[in-house]
Structures are given as C-alpha cells and as structure tokens.
C-alpha cells in the first residue's frame, strides 16, 4: 500500500492487542495506530492472570523464547512494581511422566534451572507428591500490571485507544484503515467470519492472603498456586465450551479442596479476590494475513489475524506479535 502515513487499527486492548501495537509502533514509527476495544480493561481476559511463563505446545517454543528475552530485558531494566514482571521458581507435579517430558521439550532450554526432582526432594517438599516433578525458574507477568504498563508505553507514543464495539472488519476498513490487526481473542474467529474453531475455556481463580508462599506449584496443569506481588493466585478451572462467568460455591469448594491437598498447612485461606474469564481456546494460534474487499465501499484492505493463544497469551504474546508485525509490514509493502 502506498499511504505515506499508514492507518492501522488493532482490535483488542488485552495482552495480545497491546503487544501487537507496541511491536508495530516500533517497526513502523510513522504509522497512525488506533486500538479499538469493546470493554474496560478490568473486564478483559488479560486483567487477572499471574502470567507464569509456561508453554503448552512445542510448536510455540520459538515464540516463547522471544517473549522470555523480552521479560528478561524488562526484569533487568525496569521496576517490577511498574511492569508486573518478576522472577519466580517452583514446581509442576504429575503422575504422567510424558506430560512433564513434553514440558521439557517445549521450554526446558529457555527457562532457568529446569530439572526433574529426585525422590528425596519430592518426599521432603510435598505432603502427597505426584510420581514425578519438575523444577524451573522463570518470569511471571501479572496481567493487572503488565498490560497497563504496555498501554502506558503506547499512550506516550500518542497511540489512540477507543472503546467501541466492533462487529465487522469491513466497517473498520471503511472508516479509513489500511490494515486491521485482529487481536479479538475468543471472538477473533467470529470477527474473521471464516473461523469456527475458537471456543471458550472457562477459568476461575481465587487470590488468597498468603505472603509467605513464594513458589509456584502445579499439579497436572489445572491445580496451581502462583505468587503475585500482594497475593497468591489459586486455581483453576479449565472448562471447555462453557460461557458462564458467575463464580459459584461449587467452583470455590473444588478449587480450595485441590489447593489444600497441595498445601495442607494453608487451610481456611483468606480469599481477598475472585476472578473469572473465558480464555480463547484454539488448536493453533492464528497468525495470518488476508486481502479483503469491503462490501460497503468496495475498499481493498488487509487483515492480519493474531488470536487463539489459549492460556499462553502472556507467554507467547511478544513472540507472536513479532511475526504478526512482519505480516503488517509486508501488507504495507515495507
């Protein structure tokens, strides 16, 4: 495209939208970028996670590697109280040895100090340990700090944020944008109009008052504790294809029962916050460029799809945004 000042719309102000906006602003400094979002950030899927670095699928390893380098940079150069990024160690337990070996293949050479615990360590540390356990040290990026930090960087660059509902990519293009970056998360497929593979993964977490708890601990990826700055995140539910967000007594009792089994010394924890969200489930992250023509004004425009990160948005977002930015540059002929 030949515009001297390209107009780019990014749909979504969660971790994927803000990361994309920051990457694009660095790569195309003369672009006029607008971030469109349909609700306040506090109601988004990015507001609650503790953001522990962990990769579910080996196909995403290199995206995670790029993100890890970014978190390392932030950790070295900027206060964690501003970025929400901190270094934390912990464990993942499972009776399924292959699932832990898959974790090793996905990110064992990215994080620090990755190793399997021996029997003495397992029995000393955990009251009822699983058969196998890994240990590693990595970065965690608290959503309620990390994403606002990214947004502040964008606002300093005069990037505009607009709260408006987006139901049509064509309508955004007809408003004058040359490239649209679809970071709509769970609704990315519906907005694209050609993807029915996205599905909700209902997640519920509790935040408890346990300042002495300094290490993360997982059991089979659904039961976990992750320390934040002023609380400990306890979770979770991972319920596919459920759209309801109300937190029930069944949710609380189930999570706390599993939590106390991991940490019997922390019975009757003081719950200081609850949070639920719908994670954007998809078999693979979609990073793809498409040329389209709007129905209304017959305008040619480009869409770059960037959604479907599941539970790994914070871990993969910086790396996938690098790839999405390359597609934006190509779409603009740069």
From Swiss-Prot:
FAD binds at residues 38-39, 46, 310, 315. Expressed in the intestinal cells, pharyngeal muscles, and body wall muscles in adult hermaphrodites. Its EC number is 1.4.3.1. It is an enzyme of class 1 (oxidoreductase). Keywords: Cytoplasm, FAD, Flavoprotein, Oxidoreductase. Transmembrane segments: none annotated. Its main location: cytoplasm. It catalyses: D-aspartate + O2 + H2O = oxaloacetate + H2O2 + NH4(+); D-glutamate + O2 + H2O = H2O2 + 2-oxoglutarate + NH4(+). The keyword Transferase does not apply. Its cofactor is FAD. InterPro entries: D-amino_acid_oxidase_CS, DAO, FAD-dep_OxRdtase. GO terms for biological process: aspartate catabolic process; D-amino acid catabolic process. Disruption phenotype: Mutant worms have decreased egg-laying capacity at 20 degrees Celsius and decreased hatching rate and smaller brood size at 25 degrees Celsius. Mutant worms also exhibit decreased fertilization rates but do not show any change in physical appearance. It is found in: Cytoplasm. This is D-aspartate oxidase 2. The lineage of its organism: Eukaryota, Metazoa, Ecdysozoa, Nematoda, Chromadorea.
């Amino acid at each position: 495209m030949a515009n001297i000042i390209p107009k780019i719309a990014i749909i979504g102000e969660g971790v994927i939208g803000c990361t994309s906006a920051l990457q694009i602003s660095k790569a195309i400094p003369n672009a006029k970028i607008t971030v469109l979002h349909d609700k306040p950030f506090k109601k988004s899927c990015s507001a609650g996670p503790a953001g522990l670095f962990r990769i579910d699928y080996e196909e995403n390893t290199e995206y995670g590697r790029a993100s890890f380098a970014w978190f390392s940079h932030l950790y070295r150069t900027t206060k964690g109280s501003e970025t929400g990024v901190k270094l934390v160690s912990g464990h993942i337990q499972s009776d399924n040895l292959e699932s832990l070996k898959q974790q090793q293949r996905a990110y064992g050479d990215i994080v620090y100090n990755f190793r399997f615990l021996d029997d003495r360590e397992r029995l000393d540390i955990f009251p009822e340990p699983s058969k196998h356990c890994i240990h590693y040290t990595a970065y965690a990026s608290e959503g309620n700090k990390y994403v606002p930090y990214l947004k502040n960087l964008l606002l300093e660059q005069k990037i505009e944020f607009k709260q408006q509902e987006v139901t049509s990519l064509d309508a955004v293009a007809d408003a004058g944008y040359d490239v649209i970056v679809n970071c709509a998360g769970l609704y990315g497929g519906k907005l694209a109009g050609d993807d029915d593979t996205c599905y909700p993964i209902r997640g519920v977490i509790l935040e408890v008052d346990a300042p002495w708890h300094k290490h993360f601990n997982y059991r089979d990826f659904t039961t976990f504790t992750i320390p934040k700055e002023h609380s400990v995140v306890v979770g979770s539910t991972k319920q596919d294809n459920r759209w309801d967000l109300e937190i029930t007594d069944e949710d609380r009792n189930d999570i706390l029962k599993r939590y106390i089994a991991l940490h019997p010394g922390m019975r009757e924890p003081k719950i200081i916050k609850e949070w639920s969200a719908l994670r954007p489930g998809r078999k693979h992250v979609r990073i793809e460029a498409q040329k389209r023509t709007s129905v209304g004004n017959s305008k040619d425009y480009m869409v770059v799809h960037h959604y479907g990160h599941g539970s790994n948005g914070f871990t993969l977002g910086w790396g996938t945004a690098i790839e999405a930015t390359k597609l934006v540059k190509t779409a603009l002929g740069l």
